[in-house]
Amino acid sequence: MYKRQALRAYWRPEDSGTAMPEISVGCDSISFDNHPLNVSEGSGYFVGLGWQDMIQADDRIGIALGQPVKATQVSTGTLSEVEPFLWEAYYSFKPNDSITVTPAVWGGTDVESSTDQDVFGAMLTTVFKF
């Protein structure tokens, strides 16, 4: 059995194409009863910034940073001191009215609560509308 709470908020400027970004924030908290790994509480957070119409109309640039939900309290044993961290950056643009292209890079340090678990990746998403 567990209880989970999440809080999300965002703000968007009235005018796009400005240096002022859209801002998204969030935090999560979870508590467990009788978790098989003896975790009794965990928490995580994220912050995202996005800019619209900065280079051309209908494009988006964004970054996101955060910590995935990690154990903050254990019922027995030792709590890990490792602080995992994740990030992402992307640029989305429309070469024409029916295609959207979004290249992105992402990574993380100390994923899975281990100092040896760093990750890095890139992807390209293309959306076609007919």
Placement of each model-derived feature along the sequence:
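Transmembrane beta-strands of outer-membrane beta-barrel pores
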Residues: C27-D33, D53, L65-A71, G107-V111, ...
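Residues that define the transmembrane beta-barrel architecture of outer-membrane proteins
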Residues: K3-Q5, V39-Y45, E81-W87, D118-A122
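Repeated loop/turn-to-beta-strand initiation elements of outer-membrane beta-barrel proteins
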Residues: Q5-L7, E14-I23, M54-I61, P95-P103
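Predominantly the C-terminal beta-signal and adjacent terminal strand-loop region
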Residues: S75, F85-K129
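Extended oligomerization regions of viral-like shell subunits
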Residues: P13-D15, S24-G26, F32, N38-M54, ...
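Residues on the lipid-exposed face of transmembrane beta-strands in outer-membrane beta-barrel proteins
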Residues: L7-W11, C27, V47-W51, A89-F93, ...
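Outer-membrane beta-barrel translocator domains and adjoining extracellular loop/strand segments
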Residues: I30-G42, T72-S80, E112-V119
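C-terminal hydrophobic structural anchor segments
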Residues: G50-I99
